[in-house]
Amino acid sequence: MSRRLVLAIAVAAVALLALGSLATASSSKTKTSKDTFAQFRMPSNNVFCAYVVSSSPYAKYLRCDIMSGIKPKPSGKRCVEGSRGVSADIDVTGRATFPCSSDTVYNKSATKLRYGKTWRRGGFTCKSKLAGLRCSNLSRHGFFLSRQHSYRF
């Protein structure tokens, strides 16, 4: 199952949870959508991120979309028509990738991660700075996104 499909399924599940139509029980308490899905955005409204926990092989992952101006363009990327831009994807222990994306995690209502603040969840850490967004996983792999510089590490 691709990460994109998993993300689409997770978004649908969160919508159902919000409507009270879906409940996922654990041994002693009910999991909430906050445990399985979270979103945040940069104050510039140019980077939007989604954290997803699923039962797929990509059990926990983070995806961030840069809406415009990624530099340099990831080498060899020729996105197909209809692509909305470049995303940064990473699972909890692997290396980050910069795939082309035909969907987006854009959500203007997502929590704003103010400059100088850090977001942590499920083995991921993201630091918001005026210079851009830096996210890493448990293996210390990650990515940096900004209009001026974007890279994986």
Model-inferred region functions:
Residues 17-32:
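C-terminal region of N-terminal signal peptides and the immediate post-cleavage residues
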Residues 101-134:
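Acidic, glycine-rich flexible loop segments
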Residues 1-9:
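Bacterial N-terminal signal peptides that target proteins for export
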Residues 35-46, 116-121, 125:
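Extracellular glycan-recognition/adhesion modules and their associated mucin-like linkers
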Residues 43-72:
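Short, surface-exposed binding/anchoring microloops in extracellular/periplasmic proteins
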Residues 29-31, 61-113, 145-153:
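A low-complexity, Ser/Thr/Gly/Pro-enriched, surface-exposed linker/loop concept
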Residues 127-153:
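Extracellular glycan/ECM-engagement signal in secreted proteins
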